[in-house]
Amino acid sequence: MDEQKNKDRIMQVATDLFQEKGPKFTMDELASALKMSKKTLYVYFTDKEDLFHHAVDHIFDSITDAKSKIITDETIELRERIIETLQVLPRQYQHIDFRQLYMLKDKYPRVYEHLSKRLESNWETTIELLEKRQREHVLRDFSIPVFKTIYESTLEHFFERDVLKANHISYPDALREVVEIIMNGISE
Protein backbone atom coordinates (compact mmCIF):
# COMPACT_ATOMS: atom_id res chain seq x y z
CA MET A 1 0.00 0.00 0.00
CA ASP A 2 1.44 3.39 -0.93
CA GLU A 3 2.08 6.22 1.51
CA GLN A 4 -0.93 8.36 0.51
CA LYS A 5 -3.32 5.42 0.81
CA ASN A 6 -1.97 4.68 4.28
CA LYS A 7 -2.35 8.32 5.30
CA ASP A 8 -5.90 8.39 3.95
CA ARG A 9 -6.75 5.19 5.83
CA ILE A 10 -5.25 6.58 9.05
CA MET A 11 -7.21 9.82 8.67
CA GLN A 12 -10.43 7.91 7.98
CA VAL A 13 -10.05 5.80 11.12
CA ALA A 14 -9.01 8.90 13.09
CA THR A 15 -12.15 10.63 11.80
CA ASP A 16 -14.24 7.70 13.02
CA LEU A 17 -12.56 7.88 16.44
CA PHE A 18 -13.07 11.66 16.52
CA GLN A 19 -16.75 11.08 15.81
CA GLU A 20 -16.95 8.58 18.66
CA LYS A 21 -14.74 10.27 21.29
CA GLY A 22 -14.01 13.79 20.07
CA PRO A 23 -10.37 14.87 20.13
CA LYS A 24 -9.76 12.85 23.29
CA PHE A 25 -8.94 9.58 21.54
CA THR A 26 -5.36 8.40 22.00
CA MET A 27 -2.77 7.42 19.44
CA ASP A 28 -2.77 3.98 21.11
CA GLU A 29 -6.49 3.65 20.34
CA LEU A 30 -5.87 4.80 16.78
CA ALA A 31 -3.02 2.31 16.27
CA SER A 32 -5.17 -0.47 17.72
CA ALA A 33 -8.12 0.38 15.48
CA LEU A 34 -5.78 0.40 12.48
CA LYS A 35 -4.15 -2.87 13.57
CA MET A 36 -0.74 -1.27 13.22
CA SER A 37 1.97 -0.40 15.68
CA LYS A 38 2.21 3.07 17.12
CA LYS A 39 5.72 3.20 15.70
CA THR A 40 4.32 2.71 12.20
CA LEU A 41 1.67 5.34 12.86
CA TYR A 42 4.39 7.83 13.79
CA VAL A 43 6.09 7.22 10.44
CA TYR A 44 3.14 9.05 8.86
CA PHE A 45 2.31 11.63 11.55
CA THR A 46 4.68 12.99 14.17
CA ASP A 47 1.94 13.31 16.80
CA LYS A 48 -1.79 13.77 17.21
CA GLU A 49 -1.56 17.48 16.49
CA ASP A 50 0.15 16.72 13.17
CA LEU A 51 -2.60 14.20 12.40
CA PHE A 52 -5.33 16.76 13.16
CA HIS A 53 -3.52 19.38 11.05
CA HIS A 54 -3.43 17.00 8.07
CA ALA A 55 -7.05 15.98 8.68
CA VAL A 56 -8.13 19.64 8.48
CA ASP A 57 -6.32 19.95 5.15
CA HIS A 58 -7.84 16.70 3.91
CA ILE A 59 -11.37 17.81 4.80
CA PHE A 60 -11.00 21.30 3.33
CA ASP A 61 -9.31 19.97 0.17
CA SER A 62 -12.29 17.63 -0.29
CA ILE A 63 -14.68 20.56 0.22
CA THR A 64 -12.74 22.64 -2.33
CA ASP A 65 -12.89 19.78 -4.86
CA ALA A 66 -16.64 19.38 -4.30
CA LYS A 67 -17.18 23.14 -4.67
CA SER A 68 -15.27 23.16 -7.96
CA LYS A 69 -17.50 20.41 -9.34
CA ILE A 70 -20.63 22.31 -8.31
CA ILE A 71 -19.44 25.65 -9.69
CA THR A 72 -18.57 24.20 -13.09
CA ASP A 73 -21.77 22.14 -13.38
CA GLU A 74 -23.80 24.12 -15.92
CA THR A 75 -26.80 21.81 -15.39
CA ILE A 76 -27.38 23.38 -11.96
CA GLU A 77 -29.14 26.75 -11.93
CA LEU A 78 -26.79 29.52 -10.78
CA ARG A 79 -28.68 30.40 -7.58
CA GLU A 80 -28.71 26.70 -6.63
CA ARG A 81 -24.98 26.51 -7.33
CA ILE A 82 -24.41 29.32 -4.83
CA ILE A 83 -26.51 27.53 -2.22
CA GLU A 84 -24.82 24.17 -2.81
CA THR A 85 -21.38 25.78 -2.77
CA LEU A 86 -22.03 27.42 0.59
CA GLN A 87 -23.37 24.27 2.23
CA VAL A 88 -21.18 21.65 0.57
CA LEU A 89 -20.03 18.87 2.84
CA PRO A 90 -18.59 15.83 1.04
CA ARG A 91 -20.37 12.54 1.71
CA GLN A 92 -17.43 11.03 3.60
CA TYR A 93 -17.69 13.84 6.18
CA GLN A 94 -21.48 13.92 6.59
CA HIS A 95 -21.22 11.74 9.71
CA ILE A 96 -18.58 13.84 11.50
CA ASP A 97 -19.81 15.68 14.54
CA PHE A 98 -18.36 19.08 13.65
CA ARG A 99 -19.92 20.39 16.86
CA GLN A 100 -16.95 18.86 18.68
CA LEU A 101 -14.46 21.08 16.85
CA TYR A 102 -14.81 23.74 19.54
CA MET A 103 -12.88 21.38 21.84
CA LEU A 104 -9.79 21.76 19.63
CA LYS A 105 -9.42 25.43 20.53
CA ASP A 106 -8.00 24.84 24.01
CA LYS A 107 -6.10 21.59 23.52
CA TYR A 108 -4.81 22.15 19.97
CA PRO A 109 -4.81 25.92 19.35
CA ARG A 110 -2.52 25.69 16.30
CA VAL A 111 -4.84 23.17 14.67
CA TYR A 112 -7.81 25.37 15.48
CA GLU A 113 -6.04 28.41 14.02
CA HIS A 114 -5.25 26.39 10.89
CA LEU A 115 -8.91 25.35 10.67
CA SER A 116 -9.96 29.01 10.91
CA LYS A 117 -7.53 30.01 8.16
CA ARG A 118 -8.79 27.27 5.88
CA LEU A 119 -12.37 28.39 6.55
CA GLU A 120 -11.43 31.91 5.42
CA SER A 121 -9.64 30.80 2.23
CA ASN A 122 -10.70 29.61 -1.25
CA TRP A 123 -13.56 32.06 -1.63
CA GLU A 124 -12.60 33.24 -5.13
CA THR A 125 -15.00 31.07 -7.13
CA THR A 126 -17.89 31.63 -4.73
CA ILE A 127 -17.32 35.39 -4.87
CA GLU A 128 -17.29 35.22 -8.69
CA LEU A 129 -20.67 33.46 -8.59
CA LEU A 130 -22.11 36.09 -6.25
CA GLU A 131 -20.77 38.94 -8.39
CA LYS A 132 -22.18 37.35 -11.55
CA ARG A 133 -25.62 37.02 -9.96
CA GLN A 134 -25.46 40.65 -8.83
CA ARG A 135 -24.61 41.79 -12.38
CA GLU A 136 -27.57 39.76 -13.67
CA HIS A 137 -29.82 41.40 -11.02
CA VAL A 138 -30.77 38.03 -9.56
CA LEU A 139 -29.16 39.04 -6.27
CA ARG A 140 -29.58 42.53 -4.94
CA ASP A 141 -26.57 44.74 -4.52
CA PHE A 142 -24.90 43.91 -1.20
CA SER A 143 -21.40 43.99 0.22
CA ILE A 144 -19.71 40.68 -0.56
CA PRO A 145 -17.04 41.23 2.15
CA VAL A 146 -19.86 41.67 4.70
CA PHE A 147 -21.63 38.57 3.34
CA LYS A 148 -18.39 36.57 3.62
CA THR A 149 -17.77 37.85 7.15
CA ILE A 150 -21.29 36.91 8.28
CA TYR A 151 -20.92 33.40 6.86
CA GLU A 152 -17.41 32.79 8.22
CA SER A 153 -18.23 34.28 11.63
CA THR A 154 -21.27 32.07 11.98
CA LEU A 155 -19.31 28.91 11.18
CA GLU A 156 -16.48 29.96 13.49
CA HIS A 157 -19.04 30.57 16.23
CA PHE A 158 -20.33 27.02 15.71
CA PHE A 159 -16.76 25.72 16.07
CA GLU A 160 -15.88 27.89 19.08
CA ARG A 161 -18.90 27.23 21.19
CA ASP A 162 -21.10 24.29 21.96
CA VAL A 163 -24.25 26.09 20.76
CA LEU A 164 -25.10 23.33 18.27
CA LYS A 165 -24.45 20.52 20.72
CA ALA A 166 -26.43 22.25 23.48
CA ASN A 167 -29.38 22.71 21.13
CA HIS A 168 -29.16 19.24 19.52
CA ILE A 169 -28.54 20.65 16.04
CA SER A 170 -26.28 18.78 13.66
CA TYR A 171 -23.62 20.70 11.78
CA PRO A 172 -25.09 19.87 8.33
CA ASP A 173 -28.54 21.05 9.51
CA ALA A 174 -27.07 24.25 10.94
CA LEU A 175 -25.13 24.86 7.73
CA ARG A 176 -28.29 24.44 5.63
CA GLU A 177 -30.18 26.80 7.94
CA VAL A 178 -27.46 29.46 7.76
CA VAL A 179 -27.35 29.30 3.97
CA GLU A 180 -31.15 29.45 3.75
CA ILE A 181 -31.27 32.51 6.01
CA ILE A 182 -28.47 34.25 4.14
CA MET A 183 -29.84 33.46 0.67
CA ASN A 184 -33.37 34.50 1.52
CA GLY A 185 -31.95 37.72 2.88
CA ILE A 186 -30.09 38.56 -0.33
CA SER A 187 -32.45 37.25 -3.01
CA GLU A 188 -34.45 39.71 -5.11
Protein language model features and the residues they cover:
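Hydrophobic alpha-helical connector segments
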Residues: H54, S68-H95, K148-Y151
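Hydrophobic alpha-helical segments that form the core
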Residues: R140-R161, A174-G185
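Short secondary-structure transition hinges
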Residues: R91-I127, R135-E136
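Hydrophobic alpha-helical bundle segments that form small-molecule/ligand-binding pockets
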Residues: E120-K148, L155
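Helix-turn-helix
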Residues: R9, V13, L17-D50, H54
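Alpha-helical DNA-contacting segments of helix-turn-helix folds
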Residues: E49-I59, I63, I96
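C-terminal peripheral helix-coil segments that are non-catalytic and often amphipathic
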Residues: E84, E128-K132, K165-E188
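N-terminal positioning helix adjacent to the helix-turn-helix/winged-helix DNA-binding module
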Residues: D2-V13, L78
